[in-house]
């Protein structure tokens, strides 16, 4: 068996370092009488969503952020849910919040998300904030950034991986990752050249062979094959799928073939790569919002 050549982009260790930095920043805010607060709106009792929300509040406790939970019944009306959104918009203790998705089918997700205060949008996916990202190519961003794209860029930066002038292939065009990450990567402070591939891309292997960096976010298990990668590429495995392990148990798997570790120079594990960074960036958005409100950001 040959030894893997890829170095690991360790999201767990990097996220832990970021949380330590955030703890210090929260202490500075506390000295001014300000305690950042993360709000969550959870509709129903889906086990996966409940687990995700619980993890976010556990992260809050680690860094000193106040938890504000709004756990609501599955059959809540859209108007009653909007009332909870308005309540968090007006709550001074809540500096940022999320609506856990997906929502039940009887609720219009777009209506709910657009009702959020953009300045309290901890996920960074409000249309206003995405629009600000489109419009601001070079200046300082003073609005929340999408957590997973921000986490990807930060993971690369903290491993001293240069992106300037590099050819970055993003696979997947979802609103959460694929579409906004191109906006971050093409800001002048990063200056990458971005190609966005998707299910309509005619020859994905040809694109992969030219890419210095691959960000796989399609949600298709092991679609990125080792033989298609450029030797020495940097590969971030962001996609999440659940597949049967052969024993009737669902296990989490990514978009990248494990054999990519024999070709890539750097590889993010999945799980344990971008996921912890996404959670850390959620906390960072909440703290940054509190800092802006305090006039120290």
From Swiss-Prot:
Keyword Translocase part of the UniProt annotation: no
Cellular component GO terms held in the UniProt record: cytosol
This protein's pathway: One-carbon metabolism; tetrahydrofolate interconversion
Biological process terms in GO annotation: L-histidine biosynthetic process; methionine biosynthetic process; purine nucleotide biosynthetic process; tetrahydrofolate interconversion
GO molecular function terms attached to this record: methenyltetrahydrofolate cyclohydrolase activity; methylenetetrahydrofolate dehydrogenase (NADP+) activity
Protein keywords: Amino-acid biosynthesis, Histidine biosynthesis, Hydrolase, Methionine biosynthesis, Multifunctional enzyme, NADP, One-carbon metabolism, Oxidoreductase, Purine biosynthesis
Residues annotated to bind NADP(+): 172-174, 199, 240
Listed EC numbers: 1.5.1.5, 3.5.4.9
Domain of life: Bacteria
Transmembrane segments: none
Catalytic activity: (6R)-5,10-methylene-5,6,7,8-tetrahydrofolate + NADP(+) = (6R)-5,10-methenyltetrahydrofolate + NADPH; (6R)-5,10-methenyltetrahydrofolate + H2O = (6R)-10-formyltetrahydrofolate + H(+)
Family matches, as InterPro entries: Aminoacid_DH-like_N_sf (IPR046346), NAD(P)-bd_dom_sf (IPR036291), THF_DH/CycHdrlase (IPR000672), THF_DH/CycHdrlase_cat_dom (IPR020630), THF_DH/CycHdrlase_NAD-bd_dom (IPR020631)
Quaternary structure (record): Homodimer.
NCBIfam families linked: PRK14193.1
Physiological role: Catalyzes the oxidation of 5,10-methylenetetrahydrofolate to 5,10-methenyltetrahydrofolate and then the hydrolysis of 5,10-methenyltetrahydrofolate to 10-formyltetrahydrofolate.
Family recorded in the similarity comment: Belongs to the tetrahydrofolate dehydrogenase/cyclohydrolase family.
Protein name: Bifunctional protein FolD 2
